[in-house]
Amino acid sequence: MTKILAADDSVSIRQMVSHTLKDAGYDVETANDGSDALKKAQATKFDVVISDVNMPIMGGLELVKALRGNPQYKFTPILMLTTETSAEKKQQGKAAGATGWLVKPFNPDTLLKTLKRVI
Amino acid sequence: MALDMNQLRKMFFEECRENLEVLETELLGIQPENVDPETINTIFRAAHSIKGGAATFNLLDISEFTHAMEAYLDEVRNEKLSLTSHSVDVLLRGGDCIKEMLVGHENDAPVDPELRSTVTNELKKLLESDTDSSSTESAPVEDSATVVDQNAPRVGWHVNFLPHQDLFFSGNDPLRIIGELLEIDASAEVVCDSSKLPPLAGFEAELCYLSWQVNLDGMIEEDAIKEIFEWVEDQCDLHITPQYGDLESAQTDTATAAEPEAVVEKTVSTEPQPMAESASVTKVAEKTPEKATAEDKPQRAAKADSSVSSIRVDIDKVDNLINLVGELVITQSMLTEIGNDFSNDKIGKLKSGLDQLLQNTKELQENVLNIRMLPMSFAFSRFPRLVRDLSSRLEKQVNLVISGEHTELDKTVLERIVDPLVHLVRNGIDHGLELPDVRTESGKDPMGTISLNAYHQGGAIVIEVKDDGAGIDCDRLWNKAMEKGVVSSDMRREEMTDKQVLNLIFAPGFSTANEVSDISGRGVGMDVVRRNIEELGGHIEVESAVGVGSSFTISLPLTLAILDGQLVKVAGEVYVIPLITIVESIQIDTQCVKLASGGIELYRLREENIPILRLHEEFGLGESGSLDGRLLCLVEAAGNRIGLLLDELLGQQQVVIKSLESNYTKVSGISGATILGDGSVSLILDIQGLITAFKRRQADGSSGGIAA
């Protein structure tokens, strides 16, 4: 089963992402922020990582950089789930090593569709 | 498992409140001239989360409004604009607006649009120099560019896709992209160009050397193709060209595949980005109205159970509980083992097992109660804002000192103590603290101090509200009380101690303010404060010194589920008196008993006459007989003292309160029941109720009054 790690500091968004993915039959783990996600990603190998950009302690961009530095996650799809739509932010995400982005407002169908693009 | 939107929505509301609190707390702590970038980040994040969540849950008014705040904060974060005390004010009011909108969504209550538009305008003004960034996202931009070539007879698309070598490092995969193209057009023609593959010796497995030519059906929208390449557009050379008219060009396309460089040089398209983006925004905007109405309905239906409140519990507390339950199960199985095959020589084991059970039960009880415990900061956190607003309105300088905010208190008690605390703090600033020049004149620091402190004392929590203001002048208070008829005209000032006079401020209908201001004195007096506190089983005391300040001390039980009780015996029945109400217990010396008019027995104890209430008669348990040498338990409620005549004092113990009202019916003089160790039911005395009933009887029967 495809293992997905979803990081977001908002409980409601986290729950929603996790419900949606579980409903669709994925194996999901969630993290409260970047550093939590990094810890979890180091413990288990995930097939896809979905992360918010703005989070306390460790933000999404830092998380991507850290994950890309780990040989296990060199090629793993990492999607940014964000409200930031500016080209500049997306560019920053890209530069950090993100695979793609999902623009909030979060929509379950879009999430699943986007996810299909990477697995 | 279906997505429970209502549940999630509720969670979002809760979360949003937390974010608002963060926003407010951080903003209040800011000194505009010296702002820590991390603070701005925290504030930005709070606003950002509110916006994101609100958009997700289709609360578009909130997300749009918050967007303006976020846009401004973003500029501050990027050091393009700097915070001023004015902008902090605007942001604080913005937080208020969001709060109002939240409540509006929860209760279907209309929101004052005026406040919202004022704040929005002010935010716009703050952003003046940089307004354009706020409009790009929320307003759907209709893009006409996509329509341009729709009229032309297009027979196909020619897509030339040359990934950069490092494409894999972003987690993207060209094969997935090709796969997606095949999904929108199953008959697409795909040609792979492997001419760039190096000889095996120089081959690096992690790099991408291939490129592709894909010919797609002309009926497909260009945007659909661009969307597929959206993520990799800057990691590849991409060229999408429409093919018109005849078949020839399509064939030449396949021919050019051999020399891809030529095509690349001609056209490296960077266009798709903005177009694809606006397209996706439009889609979202189209969807929202119908979705909003669809989701509003269940929300409204769920309104009825909005009173069902939830509590967020620290995971450590839950872990602890689980551990304890585990222990309990072990102890239980140990005891079962002993019981299965019991003989007298196992009595020692049984005893130690029972001890363990006792220990487990105790800890479990404590931990379960602990779940409902929240730190005082939940109540205290609103005060910085309150003080800030009040001090500027009253032109007073106030320094708020908060301590003990980590002290934990039962959620219900905490929620119900907030209003009384707000009242006390308001009073302290409005009536207590003097204006800065008055303070300077009397040699004080022009800045007054209000302190809030909470700490545990025994089984209770004590909350203090102190000010270093003018203090309460007892003589003036007395005159005022006479004027308002709060004390009967035959009372004399000398008969009362200063403390008793001070207690008059808790009398109904008494206000110390000369004028009713919009801040205090709106009819909710200190009597309500005291009543609220006493309903929680607590009490309040006041101390004050002229020129030095006043101090209110509130004692509250930690929880409403359990109380520390004194077991007493009256005519063979065991009753429980809440320990917190007991002042002292004395053996009656008949020489101190006097008979007042109306047949009331008064006990003279250190300058004070305390009426005696014979519980035997009160509860119809027979005659109580002579007072000589009997026990008198002195209890106090609402500043009134009374002596309860008892037969015997038993032990003190914590009792679990069971409601009599919900299981039987309300009984006057009894606040509840509990079950004792031997299984018998014992009634818990309602001291306040007993005193009130006693006073009422007395007022009916004679003109004399209880000396308060």
Residue ranges and their predicted role:
Chain A
Residues 15-23:
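Charged docking surfaces used in two-component/phosphorelay signaling
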Residues 25-32, 40:
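Short hydrophobic/Thr-rich beta-strand motif most characteristic of the beta2 strand and flanking loop
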Residues 45-50:
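Active-site beta3 strand of CheY-like receiver
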Residues 52, 82:
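Active-site residues of response regulator receiver
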Residues 55:
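Receiver (REC) domain active-site loop signature in two-component systems and cognate sites
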Residues 99:
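Short, glycine/charged-rich "phosphate-handling" switch motifs in NTP-dependent
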Residues 106-115:
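C-terminal output helix
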